[in-house]
Amino acid sequence: MTIVRVEPTREQTAVRLLLILDRLGDPCAAGDGAPPTAVRVIQAQRKLAKLDFLVRNPDYLADQIITACEQGRLTKERLLDARAVLEEREPELHTYRMLRNRHGAYEPMNNALAVLRHPGLIQVVRAGKSSDTHVRRRDYYLLAAGAEFAQRLRTEVPVLAWYDQQILYVRMVAEGMSAEELKALQYEHAEYAGTPVGQMIAGISERVRARLAAALEREGLA
């Protein structure tokens, strides 16, 4: 039976978001309207949340790897990465389910982001306004100090290697995708789409295990 810890700590979330920005953020420069020392950016909280969802939910990530292999976007050998994500990398110790809001997977990030903002590791910039009271989106910039700190964490805190590798798996299937594209992929799952707003999004581990076993058998990788 899979044991899922429902809620990560503020500090765990902060470190995870820092590594996501470092590995999955788009390169940027001051000439792009970015803060002076910015090196990477993820535009819109929705995209950051969708990427975080894949890091936190190994079953959904493994399923995306299988889909990418079946569509020819990844080689069949990458099915072995799906197996590693789902079965070999202690997913039960690293699964943190997320709530669903009207835009999909969501968790309040302000407290964790504050941990990164106050020492000058990231900067959150409001981009445009849809009205006098509503901001169109928030962009999340990784500053040079944040990139240096992320590298230091990799060197000094070996246990974080799990998250770093997980984020690289996410990059493999999600690089270049917009928030809307990620949302559409996640909504293909009945468990995800059918979760009422405000409720925890259900897991799909057993279904993905069956799908993975069939794919490995079909490709001669079992």
Q: Which residues make up each language-model segment?
A:
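Short, amphipathic alpha-helical interface elements at domain boundaries
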Residues: 1-91, 100
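C-terminal/domain-terminus segments
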Residues: 8, 35-38, 129-152
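Alpha-helical scaffold segments in carbohydrate-active enzymes
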Residues: 50-57, 115-118, 145
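Short amphipathic alpha-helical interaction segments
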Residues: 101-118
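A short, conserved structural fragment
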Residues: 113-129
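Short, amphipathic alpha-helical interaction segments positioned at domain boundaries
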Residues: 138-192
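Long, low-complexity, charge-rich intrinsically disordered regions
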Residues: 172, 184-222
